[in-house]
Curated annotation (Swiss-Prot):
Keywords: Carbon dioxide fixation, Lyase, Magnesium. GO terms for molecular function: magnesium ion binding; phosphoenolpyruvate carboxylase activity. This is Phosphoenolpyruvate carboxylase. Its EC number is 4.1.1.31. One of its GO terms (biological process) is carbon fixation. One of its GO terms (cellular component) is cytosol. Forms oxaloacetate, a four-carbon dicarboxylic acid source for the tricarboxylic acid cycle. Belongs to the PEPCase type 1 family. It is an enzyme of class 4 (lyase). The keyword Lyase applies. It comes from Neisseria meningitidis serogroup A / serotype 4A (strain DSM 15465 / Z2491). It holds the Pfam family PEPcase. Signal peptide: none annotated.
């Protein structure tokens, strides 16, 4: 990587921040580590081959020195990440303050494009009214850092911008001391988790993002949306188009520890966080609105609230707004108490609000009165933000989806049938299953009996649905709105879930017609399932019963698409094309049956699991597939990187909204050449499958990656694999991708591409020209190549060869690695040919700069990891070697800013 890329004048502040933090870290090392460790770290920063340097130095280090060196390299990656994040925010602010208009991906730029595209106010309002964007936080185990460590990093991030504002040496010294103190705490804190996370731990971690970020970021973003739209379209109003959703506490696919109890715990924690936020905001409003009846007029609605106020202080007699706020707070906190939350209220407790809408109505009475009586500025400040917050967060803070494997649903149905004396469900063919399920769904008679003893699994599953019904009653109808069927393969999978909803009071049958309180969402995730998505849904749409069910849910059908398993099945090219084709087919099918479609994209953080920049990914969707409706999963390290800071959260959520609106209102795009893409997919699939089905491949993978050690990292509450590892399909997608990132091959994101391009273009210049034209003009192909370019820039075939040396069968490993190395050469060459460039990241200076900063420490961590894996394979019970491997996994993930 060319280090001269850091010499751009725009990056002077970044260079200064990085140097400032590095000096603090060296100050720490001089105090805490040996001179040999300090000298080695200094040499790494200028070394062209830091992995080789590690190999040379390591024999001279004892266990403590090895630990210190590993920790130091990881900390350097962390502080450079912080410096980069601060610089991104700095450049954004400079851009905005210079009045240059909106950057790509901003709402300002999107609104400008809408205006330039002659979109009128009515069409924009119509689109906004039909727009729904949701970022869904999941508990997928990809965040390697402990919350404690993340909190240290946030403190440094908050302090670092002060460096530029220090006007004298004393101020700079004080800042240095603060950061040195935090780094010392970080140095003396365990980087790795010693115990496995529980589901409740994951719930608490997910909830912590809200007071840290979302409670501030969402109202600010809505205010910006209103400003941007009303500047161009004065009459346009912005409804609640953006929300945060979650899976944490309701996703039991592969996780036996998720239960009715964890679902209840999740909503108690949600409500505790959101009611504390409301109480704090109401308290601030109380202090900000001491308006006197002698100075202002007040609407009758507010006077009526004031008359019922528990605030009886004499001084408040002439302050109706304060008295009204006291009344509102007492009722809101009354609801908190009714939900079992242990929080007080200085005004006592009044009759609880029955719904968030009642709470909202009272707040709007305050707002209308202020506006009507000349206090608009007060109405449009904190009060407006609180109104928006209540509208978005309600009493539940964020809705949770339920998710379970189709086979688990079928097991419950089979047991219910058995005890009810019905046919043997598992022995029925698909047509018979549909008929039996529709028969049971057509009337009100339940199958479940409280007088029968069911299996633990059936009791567990029915308990979750029953708990979801109670939660909807207590916390609001929007608390649980989706139930997702993973591994959905046939129509009976949807009908089986419908039957379970009926058995637990979430679906009623009235006059033969169903009415559901929850959306039934099929998840198509393997290559075969994606190809079968349209036939499955067409069968459902032809059923009058299902048509009536959709009517009860607003005639919207949500479809979830899985990126991870399809990639593991067929490789990146085939997965991408299968997903695109599935979307194209679904768009036409939904038009045919006049059903509105909402796609839910199950993307991971890495390219191998559908990751990459969200803006480009959304714009690369087929025309008509977005149509204002989109949900996207966000997980692990992505949640931390995108949303743990209010500024980052606002910017990343703004990008989601901007891309959704652009893809919906300005969908003028052409699809890629279907035959060309299919040919590329077919050949890529052939080469990818040749590799992963090679008889020696699974052993190579298990022996030359830290997959076994990743499983012991305590990243999350669910198991790393579904069964004993003997086949690739038994391994979960996250550790599969995570492992390839650790050994620096990133194989799932590119393997097969080079051979496909070479095969298609050999002796056929027209094909090469067509692919190059697609690389210049087609959003789908551009996004695919852009993601691949980013991954290949992080790939290091020389380091990967060191991992190949871990194999217990060198001759077999030589064959497998030879295949990988040759395909890497072909893929890199093909990528450069299609991009018509001589170097990767030529047009992505930001990522090139980022890698240039971190590569020395990243490569050193890989060198340390290989050495420690060798030691661990020889001494499986060596606790020091295992700890070092865990630390290097942590550090490499930080250096790459990706896990799975």
């Amino acid at each position: 990587m060319q280090l001269h890329i850091l010499n751009n004048p725009k990056d002077a502040a970044l260079a200064a921040d990085a140097e400032f933090l590095k000096q603090s870290l060296f100050n720490l090392l001089h105090e805490e580590a040996s001179p040999l460790v300090v000298e080695t770290v200094k040499l790494l920063s200028t070394s062209d081959d830091s992995a080789a340097l590690i190999e040379k130095v390591l024999p001279q280090l004892d266990e403590q020195q090895t630990h210190d060196l590993t920790l130091a390299c990881g900390l350097f990656a962390q502080i450079l990440n912080i410096a980069e994040d601060v610089h991104h925010e700095r450049r954004r602010q400079i851009h905005e303050e210079a009045g240059r208009g909106g950057a790509e991906g901003s709402l300002t730029e999107t609104v400008r494009r809408l205006k330039a595209g002659k979109a009128d106010g009515k069409s924009v309002q119509r689109q906004l009214d039909n727009t729904s964007v949701t970022a869904v936080l999941t508990a997928h185990p990809t965040e390697v850092q402990r919350q404690t460590v993340l909190n240290f990093n946030r403190r440094i991030r908050a302090l670092l911008p002060q460096r530029e504002r220090c006007t004298n040496a004393d101020a700079l010294a004080r800042l240095r001391r603060e950061i040195d103190t935090i780094l010392l705490g970080l140095w003396q804190t365990s980087e790795t988790r010693r115990h496995k996370l529980s589901v409740n731990d994951e719930i608490n971690n997910g909830v912590s993002i809200f007071p840290m970020s979302f409670f501030e970021a969402l109202p600010k973003l809505y205010r910006k949306m209103e400003h941007d739209f009303q500047t161009a379209y004065p009459d346009v109003r912005v409804p609640d188009i953006l929300k945060i959703g979650g899976w944490i506490g309701g996703d039991r696919d592969g996780n036996p520890f998720v239960s009715a109890e964890t679902l209840r715990f999740a909503f108690r924690r949600h409500a505790d966080a959101v009611f504390r936020f409301y109480r704090g905001e109401l308290d601030k409003l109380y202090r900000e609105l001491p308006l006197s009846i002698r100075r202002v007029k007040v609407n009758g609605d507010v006077m009526a609230l004031s008359d019922k106020s528990p605030d009886e202080e004499t001084a408040r007699a002439e302050e109706p707004y304060r008295r009204a706020i006291a009344y509102i707070m007492a009722r809101a906190m009354g609801k908190a108490r009714a939900l079992g939350l242990g929080m007080g209220c200085k005004f006592g407790f009044l009759e609880p609000y029955a719904s968030a809408q009642e709470f909202l109505d009272d707040l709007k009475k305050l707002q209308h009165s202020l506006i009507d009586n000349g206090s608009r500025l007060l109405a449009e400040g904190r009060l407006a933000d609180l109104i928006r917050s209540v509208s978005v967060f309600g009493f539940h803070m964020m809705p949770l989806d339920l998710r379970q494997h189709a086979g688990k649903h079928a097991d419950v149905v089979a047991e219910l049938f058995q005890h009810a004396g019905l046919e043997d469900y598992n022995s029925l063919n698909e047509e018979q299953k549909q008929a039996a399920l529709l028969r049971e769904l057509s009337h009100q008679r339940p199958l479940y009996s409280p007088f029968i003893t069911y299996s633990d699994h059936t009791r567990h599953e029915l308990a979750i649905f029953n708990e979801a019904r109670k939660i909807k009653d207590e916390f609001g109808e929007d608390a649980v709105t989706q139930s997702i069927i993973s591994n959905c393969e046939q129509p009976s999978d949807l009908l089986a879930l419908a039957l379970l909803l009926k058995e637990t009071g979430l679906l009623a049958v009235e006059n033969g017609k169903p009415k559901s309180r929850i959306n039934i969402v099929p998840l198509f995730e393997t290559i075969e399932a994606l190809e079968n998505a349209c036939p499955v849904m067409e069968t459902m749409f032809r059923l009058d019963w299902y048509g009536a069910l959709l009517e009860s849910r607003g005639n919207i059908q949500e479809i979830m698409l899985g990126y991870s398993d399809s990639n593991k099945d067929g490789g990146y090219v085939t997965s991408s094309w299968c997903l695109y084709q599935a979307e194209l087919g679904l768009v036409e099918l939904f038009k045919k049956y006049d059903v509105r479609m909402r796609l839910f994209h199950g993307r991971g953080g890495s390219v191998g699991r559908g990751g990459g920049p969200s803006y480009q990914a959304i714009l690369a969707q087929p025309a008509g597939s977005v149509a204002g409706q989109i949900r996207i999963t966000e997980q692990g390290e992505v949640i931390t990187a995108k949303y743990a800071d209010p500024g980052n959260a606002q910017r990343n959520l703004e990008t989601l909204v901007a891309a959704t609106l652009e893809a919906s209102i300005l969908p003028d795009k052409k699809d890629p050449d279907a035959k060309l893409m299919q040919d590329l997919s077919d050949v890529s699939f052939k080469y990818y499958r040749e590799l992963i089905t090679h008889p020696d491949f699974i052993d190579y993978f298990l022996q030359t990656s830290p997959i076994q050690e990743i499983a012991t990292l305590n990243l999350g509450s669910r198991p790393a694999s579904r069964k004993t590892l003997a086949r690739i399909q038994d391994l979960r997608a996250i550790p599969w991708v995570f492992s390839w990132m650790q050994n620096r091959l990133m194989l799932p994101a590119w393997y097969g591409f080079g051979s496909a391009v070479e095969t298609l273009c050999e002796g056929n210049p027209d094909t090469l020209a067509a692919l190059r034209e697609h690389a210049q003009s087609n959003p789908f192909f551009q996004a695919m190549l852009s993601n691949m370019e980013q991954v290949m820039a992080k790939t290091d075939i020389t380091l990967a060869e060191n991992y190949a040396g871990l194999s217990e069968s060198p001759d077999k490993a030589k064959v497998i690695f030879g295949m990988i190395k040759e395909e890497y050469r072909r893929s890199r060459k093909a990528l450069l040919d299609l991009l018509q460039t001589e170097e990767l990241l030529r047009d992505n200076r930001s990522l090139a700069r980022s890698l240039a900063l971190r590569i020395p420490y990243l490569n050193a961590l890989n060198g340390l990891q290989v050495a420690m894996l060798k030691r661990l394979r020889k001494e499986p019970d060596n606790p020091h070697a295992l700890l070092m491997v865990h630390l290097t996994i942590n550090g490499v993930a930080q250096g790459l800013r990706n896990t799975g």
